[in-house]
Amino acid sequence: MAKKTKKTEEITKKFGDERRKALDDALKNIEKDFGKGAVMRLGERAEQKVQVMSSGSLALDIALGAGGYPKGRIIEIYGPESSGKTTVALHAVAQTQKEGGIAAFIDAEHALDPAYAAALGVNIDELLLSQPDSGEQGLEIAGKLIDSGAVDLVVVDSVAALVPRAEIDGDIGDSHVGLQARMMSQAMRKLSASINKTKTIAIFINQLREKVGIMFGNPETTPGGRALKFYASVRLDVRGNTQIKGTGDKKDQNVGKETKIKVVKNKVAPPFKEAFVEIMYGEGISQTGELVKIASDIGIIQKAGAWFSYNGEKIGQGSENAKKYLADHPEIFAEIDHKVRVHYGLIELDEDDVVEDTQVEDTSDELILDLDSTIEIEE
């Protein structure tokens, strides 16, 4: 019985060696035919962690889980009219340029306001803009920009406005069933590999439609078929909530609105998280407002009554004054923003953070030693 077992093990080992050799030969042939990296073991990849770029909103970065939009992935932003979809996308454009990248905007709706984009921090002199005549043209332009590998972000506004050429050439009233869905499906198949290879972020803004005859369930749907839903790594549902009233002379005016951004799909972090941001009319997302709220919630900014303080120093009475203080002191804003991101694990600890942690630990050890010596003296 023992001999039979030993013989079986030898056969298994020999068979395993033959399979391993056959696999190595196959990998060499594939690499020869298709290039290095065509097939590799997952653990051999140099970059296993998903690279991200900040969305331009701290609250949204936290909701996304990874700290921003994943590079080399497709993002869909949809919601009702005037909910803030384009504003969210323009903040991503501004953040890309801030980090030294190049952004392109495919304006299929022909409705981009340069003055508003500039107010959000977009460098309109450096922004690549295209206003295509048809859906195919817009997607072809996006594809060529992505294939170049020189563009970091491409925004398409919007999928619903990508009208197929056949529909433009036809008459109003002609039936074009499934034409836009087929166009988007083909585009996703062609663009997805190139987007991943060049590490370009592709943001598709989409509108909402309602299904006819739906009695139960959610009747809302997005145009352009299902391809974009499948290929998107992140889908954001943007909804405007309550209006924000002004202060002082503008106390009777609506100066902005609270907006809820829900991550309904996320392939790089847990989904279904929500971010609440203040979109101020003519200014975009209030970055100081969200920082004051988030930092005070986790104790980085201390709140006592109506007063806000940081590191023992008062920074304002009421949230509006605290926002103004942070806007006037960008170095304090950056310091608090960094601490919040470290708290939520969006960025790794730097040397300064490690030094601070070490000092805290040393202080606690000294306190324990003092207590022990006190006990010995009393005894």
Curated annotation (Swiss-Prot):
It comes from the Bacteria. SUPFAM superfamilies: P-loop containing nucleoside triphosphate hydrolases, RecA protein, C-terminal domain. GO terms for cellular component: cytosol. Its main location: cytoplasm. This is Protein RecA. ATP binds at residues 79-86. The lineage of its organism: Bacteria, Bacillati, Bacillota, Bacilli, Lactobacillales. GO terms for biological process: DNA recombination; DNA repair; SOS response. Gene3D superfamilies: P-loop containing nucleotide triphosphate hydrolases (3.40.50.300). Can catalyze the hydrolysis of ATP in the presence of single-stranded DNA, the ATP-dependent uptake of single-stranded DNA by duplex DNA, and the ATP-dependent hybridization of homologous single-stranded DNAs. It interacts with LexA causing its activation and leading to its autocatalytic cleavage. It is found in: Cytoplasm. HAMAP family: RecA. InterPro entries: AAA+_ATPase, DNA_recomb/repair_RecA, DNA_recomb/repair_RecA_CS, P-loop_NTPase, RecA-like_C, RecA-like_N, RecA_ATP-bd, RecA_C_sf. One of its GO terms (molecular function) is single-stranded DNA binding. PANTHER family: MITOCHONDRIAL DNA REPAIR PROTEIN RECA HOMOLOG-RELATED, RECA. The gene is recA. Keywords: ATP-binding, Cytoplasm, DNA damage, DNA recombination, DNA repair, DNA-binding, Nucleotide-binding, SOS response. It comes from Streptococcus thermophilus (strain ATCC BAA-491 / LMD-9). Belongs to the RecA family.
